[in-house]
């Protein structure tokens, strides 16, 4: 202990200084703070996102938002999720929420070959999600928001020093739990015990002997029995990689921008099920005219490529296929590329195209290809102008384009059982490989939103209010052709299935949506909040006298 003279005691008291952070959240056609929000909404930002190998945006949200249930109904890397906000217990009903990306409502109808609309945006470009859960919060988007709204905001540029970021991860996956099935020996014992007359159908014929099974012996004579785990035969340990690079800076000290590029390769748990995605994005947010005009320009592009499998046939076959049958049959009489097929013989002992059991699930995967490719561009530019003569008044115009092209080509290999058909003579069976299905599609979604916002702070009973009104226009076009190929018993070849009502096999449809909307927010004595909104939606789907519908809403809140 050190003691020095003239020691004094000094008492220091820290004065409490409360500063409330403005927790800004994005809502329909604007922003607010959480404390001023009247509707039920939730904001989820990057710090809350799920980590790991993320293929689509919905995987960032899974399990993160109370009242939001996200389930997958397929094993493919880009399988479409079922998203339900506050209920909607049906897994199959069309109860999907409206998706809004940087102010542009996107169509839940995906391009051909794309299962999940949220897989067409790079998850690494997302800054936040705002989920509008109740009717009052979502009503500003009208009838399409009846199942809730998910607003996606992408990352912005930097106003400071340049920043560069690269991230990469490699993940592996495997089937957590297979269905418990009998192995070859157990299945053989089952047949011997309960269906002894069928023992000569087990396995495959032993070409080295003409003996048939003697039911009085415990062994199965004259048959070669395998012990095939068909689930192991179609599943694999998957390896997936994800690479992302981004750069953000402030060009000339006036134009914050962010650019990114990403590459994802995802192997499905089922063999031959592969998915690739290449993405890019560019965002600029300059301010001009003494910060009176804010510009938000976005451009995002996605290229996807996947091989879609016959998931139902392969998975079902792996459960139902006889475990005493082999995967491969390399005998000289095999006609199916070395894959075993359990076919029915004709009167001459030749194989027909009729399956007596299940298609070989491995052959279903290996002898069929279905490349599905899609290209998508999503861009918009928003002008937010604060009037020089009246700073409380803002005019906002948002122009957007969502355009995509897609192509699907399904083909069978030369010895695929699925192409094995009898020719017109009824005596000979031949293979008819080649095209089975082809589709080309173009989709566009053009958007225009324009509205005025007046905001004013006052002293007295009415503390603050803002009023806005505007017009929204969206036009959807879907143009494509779909060709289905079938075996022609007269010509003996695969050719396009004729359609007298649509000789060109083309489909084309246009949907036009126009809306007027308004909203008023009132802050009374800085304690009570009142929100009133109304939207009128007009759709070209309905006849002229029934085209318009109205969505009014009101909400009242009390600040605690």
Predicted segments — roles?
Residues 1-288, 293-300, 378-379:
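Short, small/polar-rich motifs associated with maturation and membrane association
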Residues 81, 148, 162, 168, ...:
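Hydrophobic, lipid-facing positions within transmembrane beta-strands of outer-membrane proteins
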Residues 154-156, 249-251, 282, 286-288, ...:
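Residue-level signature of outer-membrane beta-barrel architecture
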Residues 159-226, 269-273, 279-378, 396, ...:
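Surface-exposed loop/interface segments of Gram-negative outer-membrane beta-barrel transport/assembly proteins
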Residues 254-257, 291-295, 390-393, 460, ...:
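Repeated loop/turn-to-beta-strand initiation elements of outer-membrane beta-barrel proteins
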Residues 398, 470, 519-521, 533:
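Exposed, low-structure sequence patches enriched in small/polar residues
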Residues 544-549:
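Short glycine/threonine-rich loop-to-helix capping motif typified by GTGT followed
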